């Protein structure tokens, strides 16, 4: 999604909606989003251009809530924004993915979460699990009982959320 006039593609099984990390939801994005709603297309969201000056992941996610009136579920958070963007944190697997700048991010390495981000990652993961738990009784029960929550608990709940278009997973990066 991202351009007006995609009616032929909206009859598909799903779509990835691209949003600008600097501008968030733009008018043409709203138009295409409404077309996808009309055709009941499940969607994932990708906040793009996180390496640009002025990129602000939290503001872009807030624009999804405010302008599209949807329930975004943040799945990744950026490691740095704008010129400082150097990777992402995968909230499901709790891993840092550092992109190599010499090949423009084509290669990467998995790493531990940077200590200075540990608290914000814990908080973001908690929000993700709570949002996913709305779509799975077993996940909700595990979470409420303080049991460890794994990928196998989270992914089916997110799938349900996406297929029912009740919530939209949000990823980020720079393509």
Q: Residues of each region from the PLM?
A:
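P-loop NTPase nucleotide-binding/switch module
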Residues: 1-3, 105-106
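Inter-motif core of Ras-like GTPase G domains
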Residues: 2-22
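P-loop NTPase catalytic nucleotide-binding module
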Residues: 20-175
């Amino acid at each position: 999604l991202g351009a007006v006039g995609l009616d032929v593609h909206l009859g598909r099984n799903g779509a990835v909606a691209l949003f600008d990390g600097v501008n968030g939801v733009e008018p043409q994005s709203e138009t295409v989003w409404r077309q996808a709603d009309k055709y009941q297309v499940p969607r994932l969201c990708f906040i793009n251009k996180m390496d640009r000056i002025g990129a602000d992941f939290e503001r872009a996610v807030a624009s999804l809530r405010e302008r599209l009136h949807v329930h975004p579920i943040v799945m990744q958070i950026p490691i740095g924004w704008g010129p400082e963007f150097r990777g992402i944190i995968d909230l499901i697997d709790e891993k840092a993915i550092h992109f190599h700048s010499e090949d423009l991010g084509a290669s990467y390495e998995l790493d531990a979460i940077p200590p200075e981000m540990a608290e914000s990652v814990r908080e973001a993961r908690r929000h993700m699990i709570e949002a996913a738990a709305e779509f799975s009784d077993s996940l909700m029960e595990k979470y409420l009982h303080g049991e460890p929550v794994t990928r196998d608990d989270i992914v089916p709940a997110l799938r349900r959320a996406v297929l029912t278009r009740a919530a939209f997973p949000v990823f980020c990066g720079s393509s």
